Amino acid sequence: MDFRSSFVDHSRVKRNEARIAAQAFGAAVRSTRVRLGITQETLAEQSQLARTYLSGVESGLRNPTVASVFRIASALHVRPSDLFLEAERTLYADNAEDDENP
């Protein structure tokens, strides 16, 4: 019996968690931006970040630095914690749906 097959690949789990968290944060940025009627181009100008970088953040493909989170939040006229709380709500809502539909 191969005991290695019974172990969880923790690096793979962590990568998956990071991807899901990045997607939730990106969705929070996007929904806030859209709610305010701001384009990615305007957000890029106001945050002094590249539009392609912001697109990557919103799609969950990029993990923003702490400095970038503060720039994005400032440009959206919200606190960084507001973006994280919205992302957290999304994550918990998704987990609750998964628990209800096994």
Protein language model annotation of sequence segments:
Residues 45, 85-86:
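Phosphate-coordinating loops and pocket residues in cytosolic domains that bind phosphorylated ligands
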Residues 1-31, 35-36, 41, 90-102:
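N-terminal flexible/basic segments that precede or flank functional cores
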Residues 29, 40, 51, 66-69:
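Helix-turn-helix DNA-binding elements, focusing on the entry/boundary residues of the two helices
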Residues 37-59:
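Short alpha-helical DNA-recognition segment
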Residues 33, 44, 73:
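The alpha-helix within a helix-turn-helix
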